Amino acid sequence: MITIDRRVQTKCSVLGRHKQVFIDMNETVHHQGSFFGRRKGHKLRAHQADLVDNLLPHLALDIELPAPDALAELFDAPVEAVRLEIGFGGGEHLIAEALAHPEIGFIGAEPYVNGMAKILARIEDQNIRNVRLFAGDAAELMAWLPARALKRIDLIHPDPWPKRRHWKRRFVQDSMIGAMARALIDGGEFRFVSDIDSYNAWTLAHLLRAPEFDWTAERADDWRKPWSGYTMTRYGRKAEREGRRASYLRFRRIAA
C-alpha cells in the first residue's frame, strides 16, 4: 500500500464509496504530447462535413496568433466573463450553458471532429452567438490563454485512461493544474465530473495538494449530487443506466 498524505487518503476513500483507492503521489507523470487519442471516428454526413468546412473557420480560435489581452474580444457581442469546457463530446452541456447564460462567452475545446460536427449543428440550429471553438489539444490552448482570463473551467466525463501506462494522457496533471491556476481569475472554479472512482480519486488527490485550489465541498451531497443547473450529458445518462454514479467536484482558485 502506498502511503500518502492522510487528508488526501481519507477523502479519496470517501469518493471511492468506502473502497480504498490509493494514488501514488510520489510518482511523477510528465506530459508528453497530446492528452487525446484518435481524432476521427465515424464518417461525417454531408451537412456535417459542410459545417466543419464552412462554419468552423468562423468560430475556431487560431492559436498561431497572439491571444487578445481580454478574451471577451473574441466574441461579437459584449460578454461579462469567459468560461472554458474541455472535451465537450457531443456538446450537450456546453450548448445548454451557452443558452442559459448569453452574458457569458464560452470556449469549447474538442479534438474529435465528430464531436465538433455535432456542436456546430446545434450552434447553427439555435443561432448561438456566444461560443468559440478550438479543434485541438487542450494543453496547447491552455498555454495560449492569457493569465487571469477565465471565470470557470469544466471537464465533464473525460476519458479516464484506466491503464497505468496511459495515465500521462489524463488531463489532470500537475502541469495542467498549474496552467489552470494561471488562467483562472481569483475565485474562479475548476469543475470536474466523472463516474470513474479511480479518476475521481486521482483528481481529488492532485487538487488537494495544489496550493492554488480549495475543494469547495462541505458535505457529501456537495459531490454526490450535480450542482444547480447542471445539464446531464448523453454519456452521463448512459452511466446512470448502467448503475455508475458520478461525482461532481468543484475547486476554487485561491486568491494569489
From Swiss-Prot:
Keyword Transmembrane: no
Catalytic activity as recorded in UniProt: guanosine(46) in tRNA + S-adenosyl-L-methionine = N(7)-methylguanosine(46) in tRNA + S-adenosyl-L-homocysteine
Keywords, alphabetical: Methyltransferase, S-adenosyl-L-methionine, Transferase, tRNA processing
InterPro entries in the record: SAM-dependent_MTases_sf, tRNA_(Gua-N-7)_MeTrfase_Trmb, tRNA_methyltr_TrmB_bact
Residues engaged in binding S-adenosyl-L-methionine: 85, 110, 137, 159
Positions of substrate binding: 163, 195
Protein name from the UniProt record: tRNA (guanine-N(7)-)-methyltransferase
Active-site annotation: 159
GO CC terms, sorted: tRNA methyltransferase complex
Enzyme class: transferase
Family: Belongs to the class I-like SAM-binding methyltransferase superfamily. TrmB family.
Cross-referenced PROSITE patterns: SAM_MT_TRMB
Organism: Rhodopseudomonas palustris (strain BisB5)
Keyword Nucleotide-binding assigned: no
Function: Catalyzes the formation of N(7)-methylguanine at position 46 (m7G46) in tRNA.
Pathway: tRNA modification; N(7)-methylguanine-tRNA biosynthesis
Encoding gene (name): trmB
